[in-house]
From Swiss-Prot:
Residues 1082-1154 form the BIG2 domain. It is found in: Nucleus membrane. Its main location: nucleus. Residues 1-35 form the signal peptide. The gene is NUP210L. It comes from the Eukaryota. This is Nuclear pore membrane glycoprotein 210-like. It is linked to Spermatogenic failure 97: An autosomal recessive, male infertility disorder characterized by oligoasthenoteratozoospermia. Infertile subjects have low sperm count, poor motility and highly abnormal spermatozoa with strikingly large heads due to highly uncondensed nuclear sperm DNA. One of its GO terms (cellular component) is nuclear pore. It comes from Homo sapiens. Belongs to the NUP210 family. The chain crosses the membrane at residues 1813-1833. The keyword Transmembrane applies. Gene3D superfamilies: 2.60.40.1080. Keywords: Glycoprotein, Membrane, Nucleus, Signal, Transmembrane, Transmembrane helix.
Length: 1888
């Protein structure tokens, strides 16, 4: 924007700065004296050089203008630099000009031209002695920002040169001596600045353009490692200066997320992510990391912490760090490469484990607790430690919170409760709360916070702040009045601070009044809430330059004396967007109004008014005389002249549209003439408007005006002119308004056209062509007009034109009679040969002429046909006589042809200059126009002679080849959709997993754009070839099978992996590579075992090895399903005796074709047999004492192992016995861990030898089901027996210390260790071997190697001590073969006293250890056996090698029996088999568990010391569990895992599936009922969920029962509800009863406890006669819906009601009444008794008018005695049904006149005072007859379901309705009889 002239600005702002001008001048003078002039450097050192382009240096002064001078021009020259074309210089360029390689100096003097102050700089020129490379870092990252390297040059004294700009250097990458010999550019590369996204110094950019290198370069990392960069000076003079080297490390830009220090609470965790920066993008790195490992180091435990444990634990696989105790530790990266571990740039962070201190709230945005309705806020609950440091909140923290739902809508809440996205709903003040409650450990153990931490925050919510209007705009008016505007504000707290973002433009007052206009610019006025400045309303205010003005729509014609308001809008036009902004107020601008015709309109009152809603100013004009004028309104402000004009009463010129000049028609034809324009009807007198068309000879033509219902234009006028006789004449058209009083001089326009009526002289017939835009017309009629091609496929439209004798074309010839004919109607014909369709066509001038169209019907046959048109005559009978000489016919010959087609229609062309594609044009007329939809994609050559198109590709692109047939009816061009494409992708299709020595088909295709394949004829232009990474496979080409691909045969020759790629080149030589296909050559797939022997009903699983890795799913099938069956896991179950074959195949589905691909397959022979006999397999029968040996049952053959029969269903039982029990013990397997297996699993036992002797072991195998056919001959049992000899081991009696010998297997090794190693020199040697020296060898360093011969040797070990003493020990070494092995289990399992385990607990981790023995039971000290592990199934037990030799780790994952077999690969007979049974160790059974069930879990497992373990739960929201006692409450449907953990021993679990409760079952004690008597017995309603009848599972201990009632609170699951059954009773049950839920441990069900609330008198009165019961029901909190809700009806007996607390009797009136309301069964059980014999209570009587009212009469027997009684007398009223007991005090009153009257009058006044409205109604009724009253009373009884009875309390007078002179009605009379009169007025009531 440009402002006003400078003079205007100075006038506008002079006043603003005048008062402060002298202060600014004074400050400037002070600063001028204090701020000294300085140069940027005091000394400069420049290098000597002999090559052109000397090194420049820029010298700068801070302020002033200077002249520059050098004292030694031969050494240094100085060139001043002048800025902005002035003569002021603050900079100069120094250039070293020395020609001698010696040190020279010069002084640069800079003199300030105003103050004459002189500055000095010393400049030296010297020779470069050495150079070095300066870098900000020695480490750079792969594919990251480049590193800038700079050369620093030093002279002989070590001084640094000031600049090296312009000197040429040679940069290169040198060999790194510390790294492996690799390609020099493999680690880094040198970049130009033009290749990077960084701006270089100007001189560097210029040098790079000249392919030179300067003193600054960029290097970029390619891959990790070290590299050396070398630089030397290019100038030959400095060739002896040594090159500078720098060694750089290239690292991956890897970092931790988060990377800052973290504070954790004990038990919480944080999951780290590792990411790296690649080309500016962050990419996550998956674990495990390729080059790094994460470690926790420097564990610093807090005071009182356990130093044996770590502060935190790191999970390597997930990078999750879990805090275990207070302290701190460091999480660091460690490079796997040892040489790279010295890198300092690897990320790390510190983790602090702290205690929670307090909580804090934060709210965003704004961080102020003054919020706005409708806005969304993020409320964060932060946890801080005691040092006020924020703690990382992990997902396992639990924070409870309370945000009132009335004020907040929670849109998102995290699980831990720390992060909330809420929406403020309503205004007000509210308090939110949060508490840190617990931490959930990874084992689902919930650890409550020791000291509960709470925090609360007060929040104020207001409505949004809204300012109106939305914006303000004022024109810039520097010398005029200021514009003022009051901004309206709504919402907020009501207290605002008003600010303007630009107070020079807009000033705003504290009341919101803005003032602007004198300074141009924009400003935003903010109304900020004082309570929260972040909450504000804003309005944009613009003071802009006036660019445009316009007069808004208005009335343009007006009567004389009327006034027109011309609204004026003014705008500012944005130069960039061209958008216009209307000003709000421009009324202060002075307007000028001008008119081109003076006196027609005049300006009224100078024309300026206040702005309106749609305009910013206005003016008024008044009409003084008739006419037309141009009103111009202009404004001249700020040297800007703008104007806007409006024309009044104007019309368009009159013109003839059709015809323009002449119309030509045949006799009796019609021409439609169209005229446009002329004066419009005057708006004040439209009736005076006229128009007319006049003819010279009216008898020869007929004229009729056409009135169309909706004309195209309102000022168009249409006439139909019919020729009645031949000839020519002129037609005149006039239009205007007749003169009138208000329009005395109207305009009238006249226009003339010629109308000719003549005979036709000639005709022409041509096909109608739709010529494409821009194409030439068909050339054929010009060359050969008698043979015109037309389409044989489509009907052709033939056009007939008729001409007169002057060759003028007729406008209309529809009166002619014509006849059409075809010479060959088998080729073409006319359906109606006499008719013709007249079609109007524009000739380009706007005049339309009618042409005759006839459709030629074709029969889709090629050929030639002659078409003729004959003129028969006129359609009218009386035709002119001169038609005999007129033309009779016209002929044209047509050629019927096909449409042109392009062959082929679709093609993808390879973009290569050697490619030329030819497309044929088939059929058509032969005259074509060839176009392309896109230019520049191909070169098109149309070869007309060959009727073809040749294309040469230029650039890639998609285009359509369009061929237009110029001489056929145009329905669109013939098209060919073509695509010119470069190589986009190379595609390889093959099976990437190949078994060795097999072949697969390889297909290669080249794809262009849109994945379209190229034809293989282009492959030679692409130099396509296949390349293998290794030679483990071979490729052989095949013959072509299709035109889009090449095929090869791939043969696998060696096992391994390789990569296959396809390579091609484009025309630019760029190489394209396909996606590498990784090919795996895998070993043959095998199923194990090769043969399987089973008995019927026994199961064993087929295992697999080999095949592709990782192995795909194996699909199993069996050849004979009657012998055995196999499932998808490969588990084979025998059925009957026989053989079968199990087939296993590895297959997958091709993602592209969907076909099943079989990689490999194998088979297993299955034999199902019956056991003929059993035998005990004992590896040795002679054993030493105190040893162990396994024994197990086998079949008669070696294939009948325990795998064959030990897993049958029904199974076998094994019973073992011994002849002598004192020689050995025969114990089951796993007895070492205190497991007692059932007899079905005892196929293997362990012999424990105790004493010398001989005994026999016998086993008997029983068949549990004889029909299963498991034993041969249908036997029920088989047995076997074996003899065992136990003898004592050889021992010496003297000395007492028995020598021990080393026992080693054959061909094994053993490393000896002594206790003197490191302290003395220890050596060993073999003294003697038997039978020869090959038994054992020793290397002198303690390594024993056993040979292949069994024998013994003597070993001597010598220790030479440093203090001069030598020690020697001699031991024996025995080498023997291994006879048997034994498997033992760990850890030991302990159970509660009297309890046993028959199986391993589910989830337990087991360790199996293998020990080896010789032939007599001695255990070997070392081993060399290669063991083979086999399982009968792999789905129940996960087993693998342990962390020690000959140990296996197993995890029990499913219930069932798994057989584990171990044997020597070289000696399969040396084996051991053990059963591993897995069962639940947690009780009870959790099947059919429903929401609401309470489960008391228990287990027999204990620790070694008899202590129980710890309970844990996986989903506490599903099964809320007390971790101390192990009791849980099912709170919501789902699946949860209950864990029991005994640390260091066992951790077991059980799955609990909680089902949703279908419905709740309700019941109660039928002997009980409800009443509303206060302090009545509590009513209990029993509820059960599910289908079990009770909700308590398992046996609950007292501690568990206490946890149920105190901790778990299951009653919170249930919501109880009650409701009266009588819907007409307008009393909610919640006012009568208090209901809450509970759980009964005795019954094991939920209970709804219903208690009676205190009730008001009105409520007791209304309920006393209520006939209703009570509905009771319950709902679960988690299931709010009432679907399937069951209600139960509970009897209800209401309490009786009495509203009398006392009864007053007198001497004259000694009889009183007590009225009781109640239901009949309550009234029948009432007992009314007097406390004294002085009063007598008579029997009650019922009111005939009011049901439920009982009246008791009380009479005084002796009034004197009654008056003299010291103690009060009571009438006691009680009922056993409702357990009520009420008392009415009866007291005596002294005799007074009218006492009784006053008493009853008081009752009446009290009643009428309370029911004034009712008494008004009664007063009106009493004025009528008694019969009307009775009818009205009956009506009230009908509408009243529950009477609300008002009983006034006696003795308290109230103001009555009747005055003292009035008499009450007779039915309210105070005279006897009391029972009748009082009853009536007492019962009068209305329904509330």
């Amino acid at each position: 924007m440009t402002g006003c002239p400078a003079s205007s600005r100075r006038r506008g702002f002079g006043l603003f700065f005048f008062l402060r001008l002298h202060r600014l001048l004074l400050l400037f003078l002070v600063l001028r004296g204090t701020l000294a002039n300085k140069l940027n450097v005091p000394q400069v050192l420049l290098p000597f050089g002999r090559e052109p382009g000397r090194v420049p240096f820029l010298l700068e002064a801070q302020r002033g203008c200077y002249t520059w001078h050098s004292t030694h021009h031969d050494a240094v020259t100085v060139e001043p630099l002048y800025e902005n074309g002035t003569l002021c210089s603050q900079k100069a360029v120094l250039i070293a000009e020395s020609t001698q390689p010696i040190r020279l100096s010069s002084i640069i003097l800079a003199r300030e031209i105003v103050t004459d102050h002189e500055l000095r700089c010393d400049v030296k020129v010297d020779v470069i002695n050495s150079i070095e490379i300066v870098s900000r870092a020695r480490e750079l990252y792969v594919d990251d920002s480049p590193l800038e390297l700079m050369v620093r040059a030093l002279d002989a004294e070590g001084n640094t040169f000031s600049s090296l700009a312009g000197m040429m250097f040679e940069w290169s990458i040198a060999q790194d001596n510390e790294s492996a010999r690799e390609e020099l550019s493999s680690k880094i590369r040198i970049l130009k600045y033009s290749e990077a996204e960084y701006a270089p110094p100007i001189y560097i950019a210029e040098m790079e353009k000249e392919e030179k290198q300067g003193d600054v370069i960029l290097v970029s990392g390619i891959r990790t490692g070290a590299a050396v960069v070398k630089v030397r000076i290019h100038e030959p003079f400095y060739k002896k200066v040594a090159a500078a080297l720098i060694r750089l490390l290239v690292l991956e830009n890897i970092f931790l997320i988060p990377s800052h220090d973290i504070y954790l609470l004990v038990g919480t965790y944080i999951k780290y992510q590792v990411a790296k920066m690649v080309q500016g993008r962050v990419t996550e790195v998956k674990f495990p990391l390729e080059h790094y490992i994460l470690e926790l180091q420097d564990h610093r435990v807090a005071l009182n912490g356990s130093h044996s444990e770590k502060v935190a634990i790191l999970d390597d696989k997930t990078a999750m760090v879990t805090a275990s105790q207070l302290g701190q530790t460091n999480l660091v990266f460690v490079h796997k490469n040892v040489h790279m571990r010295s890198v300092s740039g690897l990320p790390n962070c510190t983790i602090y484990v702290v205690e929670p201190g307090f909580l804090g709230f934060t709210v965003q945005p704004g961080n102020r607790w003054s919020l706005e309705v409708g806005q969304v806020y993020v409320i964060t609950v932060d946890v801080f430690d005691k040092s006020s440091t924020k703690v990382y909140i992990s997902d396992n923290l639990r924070i409870t919170y309370d945000f009132p739902k009335e004020y907040f809508e929670e849109q998102l809440t995290t699980v831990n409760g720390s992060y909330h996205i809420v929406k403020a709903l309503k205004d007000g003040v509210v308090v939110i709360n949060a508490s840190l409650t617990s931490i959930i450990y990874q084992n689902k153990d919930i650890q409550p916070i020791k000291f509960l931490i709470k925090h609360q925050q007060e929040v104020k919510i207001y409505f949004p702040i809204m300012l109106t209007p939305k914006f303000l705009a004022f024109p810039h008016h520097p010398m005029g009045m200021l514009y003022r505007y009051k901004v309206q504000v709504e919402g907020g707290s009501g207290n605002f601070t008003w600010t303007s973002s630009n107070e020079t433009v807009v000033i705003v007052t504290t009341k919101g009044v803005v003032t602007a206009g004198q300074v141009r610019g924009n400003s935003t006025v903010l109304a900020r809430d004082v309570q929260n400045p972040f909450r504000y309303g804003e309005i944009k205010i613009h003071v802009l330059k006036l660019n445009k003005m316009e007069l808004l729509p208005f009335h343009a014609d007006v009567e004389i004396g009327q006034i027109i308001e011309i609204p004026i809008a003014m705008y500012h036009i944005n130069k960039e967007t061209k958008e216009a902004m209307a000003f709000t107020d421009c009324s202060h601008l002075s307007l000028d109004l001008n008119m081109d015709k003076q006196g027609v309109f005049t300006l009224l009152k100078e024309g300026i008014q206040r702005p309106g809603p749609m305009h910013c100013s206005s003016t008024h004009i008044a009409a003084k005389s008739l006419g037309h004028t141009l009103v111009t309104v202009s404004v001249n402000e700020c040297d800007k002249y703008l104007e806007s004009s409006a024309t009044f009463a104007a019309y368009e010129p009159l013109k003839a549209l059709n015809p323009v000049e002449v119309a030509l028609v045949t006799w009796q034809s019609v021409k439609e003439m169209v005229f446009e324009g002329g004066p419009r009807p005057w708006i004040l007198e439209p009736s005076r408007f006229f128009l007319e068309l006049n003819a010279e000879k009216t008898e020869k033509i007929g004229i009729a005006q056409v009135w169309l219902p909706s004309k195209r234009k309102q000022n168009q006028y249409i006439y139909r002119i019919q020729c009645l006789d031949l000839g020519e004449q002129v037609l005149t058209f006039r239009i205007g308004n007749h003169p009138g009083v208000l329009n005395p001089s109207p305009a009238v326009e006249v226009l003339q056209v010629r109308f000719i009526c003549a005979h036709p002289a000639s005709m022409s017939v041509t096909p109608v062509y739709k010529v494409p835009a821009g194409a030439q017309p068909c050339p054929l009629p010009q060359h050969n007009k008698w043979l015109i091609p037309v389409s044989r496929l489509r009907d052709t439209v033939l056009e007939l034109a008729v001409f007169d004798q002057h060759r003028r074309k007729f406008d209309n010839f529809s009166s002619l009679m014509l006849e059409w004919k075809s010479s060959n109607e088998t080729l073409a014909h006319f359906e109606d040969y006499k008719s013709v369709e007249m079609v109007a066509k524009d000739d380009g001038s706007g005049q339309t002429r009618l042409h005759g169209h006839q459709i030629l019907k074709v029969h889709q046959i090629k050929g030639t046909v002659l078409i003729g048109v004959n003129f028969v005559g006129y359609s009218e009978k009386k035709s002119p006589k001169e038609i005999s000489n007129l033309p009779r016919s016209v002929d044209v010959e047509l050629l019927l042809v096909d449409d042109v087609t392009v062959v082929p229609e679709n093609a993808t062309i390879y973009n290569h200059p050697d490619v030329k594609e030819t497309f044929s044009l088939v059929e058509g007329s032969g005259y074509f126009l060839v176009n392309s939809s896109e230019q520049g994609v191909v070169t098109i050559t149309y070869m007309e002679a060959e009727s073809s198109v040749e294309l040469v590709p230029l650039h890639p692109g998609f285009f359509t080849l369009e061929v237009y047939d110029l001489c056929l009816a145009f329905l669109g061009p013939a098209t060919a959709h073509l695509r010119v494409s470069d190589i986009q992708e190379l595609e390889l299709d093959l099976i990437d997993k190949v078994e060795i020595d097999k072949t697969v088909l390889v297909t290669v295709r080249v794809l262009g754009s849109s994945k379209r394949p190229f034809q293989n004829k282009y492959f030679r232009n692409m130099e396509l070839k296949l390349q293998l990474a290794s030679a483990i496979v071979t490729l052989t080409p095949m013959e072509q099978q299709d035109e889009y691909s090449e095929n090869y045969i791939l043969r696998a020759t060696t096992i391994g992996q390789t990569t296959l790629v396809a390579i091609a080149k484009d025309k630019m030589g760029r190489k394209y590579t396909s996606t590498p296909r990784h090919i795996e050559v895998f070993p043959p797939f095998r199923l194990l075992p090769e043969k399987m022997t089973l008995i019927p009903m026994n199961m064993m699983q087929v295992m697999s090895e080999g095949g592709p890795q990782p192995q795909s799913i194996v699909h199993f099938s069996i050849s004979n399903q009657t012998v055995a069956v196999v499932n998808r896991r490969g588990q084979v179950t025998g059925k009957i005796v026989g053989t079968a074959v199990v087939h296993g195949t590895i297959q997958t589905v091709n993602e592209d074709t969907g076909k099943v691909i079989v990689f490999s397959q194998d088979e297993v022979q299955i034999e199902v047999v019956q056991l003929r006999a059993v035998r005990i397999l004992a590896a040795a029968t002679r054993l030493i004492t105190a040893t162990k040996m396994p024994v197990y049952v086998m079949g008669v053959t070696s294939t009948q192992t325990p795998f064959s029969f030990s897993n049958a269903n029904p199974g076998l039982t094994f019973h073992w016995s011994m002849s002598k029990r004192d020689v050995l013990d025969l114990v089951p397997r796993h007895s070492e861990v205190f497991l007692q297996l059932p007899v079905e699993h005892n196929f293997a036992m362990v012999v424990h030898t105790k004493a010398a002797g001989r005994t026999s072991i016998k086993v008997t195998v029983h068949c549990m089901n004889s029909s299963s056919g498991q034993f041969e001959g249908n036997l029920l049992e088989l047995s076997d027996e074996v003899q065992i000899l136990v003898f004592e081991k050889l021992q010496l009696f003297y000395p007492e210390c028995q020598p021990e010998q080393i026992l080693m297997p054959i061909n094994s090794q053993l490393k000896l260790h002594t206790n003197r190693e490191g302290a003395a020199f220890v050596s060993s040697r073999v003294l003697k071997c038997f039978p020869n020296s090959s038994v054992i060898e020793e290397d002198g360093e303690g390594l024993l190697k056993a040979g292949s011969i069994a024998g013994t040797a003597v070993l001597e070990v010598t220790s030479i001590e440093p203090f001069g003493v030598n020690q020697t020990t001699i031991t024996g070494v025995q080498v023997a073969p291994v006879t048997y092995l034994r498997v033992s289990s760990q850890p030991k399992l302990y159970t509660a006293q009297g309890r046993t385990l028959s199986a391993f607990p589910l989830g337990m981790s087991l360790t199996f250890t293998v020990q080896f023995y010789n032939s007599i039971g001695e255990k070997f000290h070392t081993h060399n056996t290669q063991l083979y592990l086999a399982l009968n199934r792999d789905d129940l037990l996960h087993i693998g090698p342990g962390n020690k030799n000959y140990t296996y780790m197993a995890q029990a994952v499913n219930r069932g029996l798994t057989l584990v077999g171990l044997w020597d690969r070289r000696h399969p007979g040396m084996a051991d088999y053990i059963p591993v049974a897995v069962e639940h160790a947690i009780e009870p059974d959790t099947k059919l568990t429903f929401v609401g069930d309470i489960i008391c879990f228990s287990t027999h497992l204990v620790s070694q010391h008899g202590e129980p373990g710890i309970w844990m739960i996986s989903a506490n929201n599903i099964l809320q569990t007390d971790i101390v006692t192990g009791v849980g409450v099912a709170r919501s449907p789902g699946t949860a895992m209950i864990f029991h953990d005994i640390p260091g021993v066992v951790k077991t679990y059980r799955e609990v599936v909680v089902n949703a409760s279908s419905r709740l079952m309700l019941s109660y004690d039928l002997k009980t009922y409800l009443t509303n008597t206060l302090n009545s017995t509590v009513f209990k309603l029993f509820i059960t969920t599910g289908r079990n009848g009770v909700n308590l599972k398992g046996f609950c201990t007292p501690n568990q029962a206490l946890a149920i009632t105190k901790v778990l609170l299951p009653a919170t699951l249930m919501l109880c509800h009650v409701q009266f059954s009588n819907t007409l009773l307008d009393i909610p049950a919640s006012k009568v009863f208090q209901v809450h839920s509970d759980f009964s441990m005795e019954k094991g069900v939920y209970v709804c406890i219903i208690k009676v609330r205190p009730q008001s008198e009105e409520l007791l009165q209304a309920l006393s006669v209520a006939d209703t019961s009570v509905y009771g029901w319950a709902t679960l909190v988690s299931e709010r819906s009432k679907n399937g809700m069951q209600r139960i009806l509970i009897p209800f007996i209401p309490a009786f009601y009495i509203n009398q607390s006392e009864l007053v009797l007198s001497h004259k009136q000694d009889i009183g009444e007590i009225r009781v309301l109640g239901v009949d069964r309550v009234l029948r059980k009432l007992e009314v008794i007097s406390s004294s014999p002085v009063l007598v209570v008579a029997g009650h009587s019922h009111s005939p008018l009011t049901p439920g009212l009982a009246i008791y009469s009380v009479r005084v027997v002796n009034f004197t005695s009654f008056q003299q009684m010291a103690s009060p007398v009571f009438i006691n009223i009680s009922c056993v049904l409702t357990s009520q007991s009420e008392a009415v005090v009866v007291r005596a009153m002294k005799d007074k006149l009218g006492a009784d009257h006053c008493e009853d009058s008081a009752i009446l006044k009290r009643f009428t005072g309370s029911y004034q409205i009712l008494l008004l109604t009664l007063f009106a009724v009493l004025a009528s007859t008694a019969s009307i009253f009775l009818a009205y009373n009956a009506f009230l009884n009908k509408i009243q379901t529950v009477p609300v009875v008002y009983v006034p309390t006696l003795g308290t007078p109230q103001p009555g309705f009747f005055n003292s002179t009035s008499s009450p009605p007779h039915f309210m009379s105070l005279q006897p009889p009391l029972a009748q009169s009082r009853l009536q007025h007492w019962l009068w009531s209305i329904r509330h």
